[in-house]
Amino acid sequence: MKKQIFAVSMAVLLATGVAFAAIQQGQVMYKQADGTYVVNTTSLTPNVKGFKGATPLEVYIKNNKVVKVEALPNRESPKLFDRVKQVLLPKFNGMKVAKAAKAQAVDGATGATYSSRAVKENVAAAVAYYKKNK
């Protein structure tokens, strides 16, 4: 009996998690419980491309500051895009939204020019979307 209750409980929990993820996945922006806005650029900037294709991001914003920028799966060269993740993405952490809107002014990662340019365009688009829709 306990095993059945546990199995049903786990199934309900899993179904709830999958449903919640599916709802958020289709949205460009959603608000987390702690007040952080998350802007997903997958559908926002489908034509912004790095060297090998789109470079979607999730940009986390709280109190008009970028908390962090996370790269989503893409087709860029892992070795070069790792450089972007290590060098460029952390530069946005703690940056005010007004400054992040001018992301093209941020220095990119050496050797990953196209990827850097695409990431900066994605950040600027995410911040603009946040400012318009928060």
What positions do the PLM features span?
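Flexible, solvent-exposed loop/hinge segments and secondary-structure transition points
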Residues: 5-7, 17-117, 121-134
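Repetitive helical segments and hydrophobic/amphipathic motifs
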Residues: 11-13
